[in-house]
Amino acid sequence: MMKILISNDDGVNAIGIVALTRSLSQIAETLTVGPDRNCSGASNSLTLTNPLRLNTLDNGFISVSGTPTDCVHLAIRELYQDEPDMVVSGINAGANMGDDTLYSGTVAAAMEGRFLGFPAIAISLVGHEHYETAAHYALKIVKALQDNPVAQDKILNINVPDLPLSEVKGMKITRLGARHRAEGMVRTQDPAGKEIFWLGPPGDEQDASDGTDFHAVANGYVSITPLTVDLTAFEQLKALDNWLANISEK
């Protein structure tokens, strides 16, 4: 039986990670290791100035006093006697599409699995209701990856529309869309009258054209986007060579 490490960024007690573990336990030996609090927006951050503390919960899940990336790194390096066959992160409560992926702890947990050499996927529900739909597609995709894995230098970022399973139209391979910049900060006061700020909501879709993750989900499809950690803008290399040459000549 394959071994799957499960993590997330919503916290080890979140509905999504429970649903994901229940689903994948049908075909795999699972180890669920998640942060002891909500770490949404943690991206690839690591805990460098404090020790990590573990706590095994009544359901067998392990909570970690760190980030999603910490959880995956610690689990693979210290908790497994043998290595897992795959890392699956989710089910996130809310979309991780377009620019969201830069901030997402869900995506980061999968990326850490990839850094350590394992196939990895991140799965998000674009809403907060139909976790069983996302769990169904997680199981379906993991089964497919058993037989036909993708390159280990990539992860799959999956976003599932918040619909009953019977209403989902299928799956599509997509590229990342893009959002407009986020709305302004929310300024308010704490109980002592001191000024405080909250991050505003994310921006609306800027690029939700055909072929993007936004377009697929909006039209009732599961989006599957391959991601890589190489952020090099290859199409700019030649132009920047010319730019640098002009600087050097002055």
UniProtKB/Swiss-Prot annotation:
<dbReference type="GO" id="GO:0000166">
    <property type="term" value="F:nucleotide binding"/>
</dbReference>
<feature type="binding site">
    <location>
        <position position="92"/>
    </location>
    <ligand>
        <name>a divalent metal cation</name>
    </ligand>
</feature>
<protein>
    <recommendedName>
        <fullName>5'-nucleotidase SurE</fullName>
        <ecNumber>3.1.3.5</ecNumber>
    </recommendedName>
</protein>
<dbReference type="InterPro" id="IPR030048">
    <property type="entry name" value="SurE"/>
</dbReference>
<comment type="function">
    <text>Nucleotidase that shows phosphatase activity on nucleoside 5'-monophosphates.</text>
</comment>
<dbReference type="GO" id="GO:0008254">
    <property type="term" value="F:3'-nucleotidase activity"/>
</dbReference>
<dbReference type="InterPro" id="IPR002828">
    <property type="entry name" value="SurE-like_Pase/nucleotidase"/>
</dbReference>
<comment type="similarity">
    <text>Belongs to the SurE nucleotidase family.</text>
</comment>
<keyword id="KW-0479">Metal-binding</keyword>
<keyword id="KW-0963">Cytoplasm</keyword>
<keyword id="KW-0547">Nucleotide-binding</keyword>
<feature type="binding site">
    <location>
        <position position="40"/>
    </location>
    <ligand>
        <name>a divalent metal cation</name>
    </ligand>
</feature>
<dbReference type="GO" id="GO:0008253">
    <property type="term" value="F:5'-nucleotidase activity"/>
</dbReference>
<dbReference type="GO" id="GO:0005737">
    <property type="term" value="C:cytoplasm"/>
</dbReference>
<dbReference type="GO" id="GO:0046872">
    <property type="term" value="F:metal ion binding"/>
</dbReference>
<feature type="binding site">
    <location>
        <position position="9"/>
    </location>
    <ligand>
        <name>a divalent metal cation</name>
    </ligand>
</feature>
<keyword id="KW-0378">Hydrolase</keyword>
<dbReference type="Pfam" id="PF01975">
    <property type="entry name" value="SurE"/>
</dbReference>
<dbReference type="GO" id="GO:0004309">
    <property type="term" value="F:exopolyphosphatase activity"/>
</dbReference>
<dbReference type="InterPro" id="IPR036523">
    <property type="entry name" value="SurE-like_sf"/>
</dbReference>
<feature type="binding site">
    <location>
        <position position="10"/>
    </location>
    <ligand>
        <name>a divalent metal cation</name>
    </ligand>
</feature>
